[in-house]
Amino acid sequence: MSQRCNWVKTEADAHYHDTEWGVPSHDDRHLFEMLILEGAQAGLSWSTILNKRAGYREAFADFDVDAVARFTPTRIEKLLENPGIVRNRAKVESAVTNARAVQRIREEHGSLAAFLWSFVGGTPVQNAWQSYRDAPASTEQSDALSKALKAYGCKFVGSTICYALMQATGMVNDHEAGCPCHARCAALGGKQPARRRKAS
């Protein structure tokens, strides 16, 4: 594939970019996975997380929300010895905290997908950046999502992390305009006009 988005640096990046990033997702398990992985990525490269993704799936019960919500302090201590994940206590504990928050979100909103997608009106925002460097780090929508997730007790859900989650799960199409994946994701997601970038 020619003219991929310029953030793609490795083969793992390329596979993720070509097959998953920006594709609209309404699957609660996948959305929970990306919520946890985007939080784990804070301060690290995304390539580091992609290289540990299989380890995360094994360590966190294939991202079954109810299973992770039942993790005990003993289970958390064992995870902190697992080289297959980022062994940061706050991040590991946040995965369990966030699973319990997602349970409450599902009870109140029917699904995690319904809750998350409500912040873009149920339809992906279609941007058309000439370069990925032009894309914002956060928007009014990610600010609102961050605030709402924090209200449920979620951790590692700042606005920048939330915007990365929105990009990853297709709530926002931030593929570069010249990237072949842009048109494919746009066709999958509909035609909502691009939102203006948040003022700095």
Which sequence ranges carry the predicted segments?
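HhH-family (HhH-GPD) DNA N-glycosylase catalytic core used in base-excision repair
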Residues: 1-200
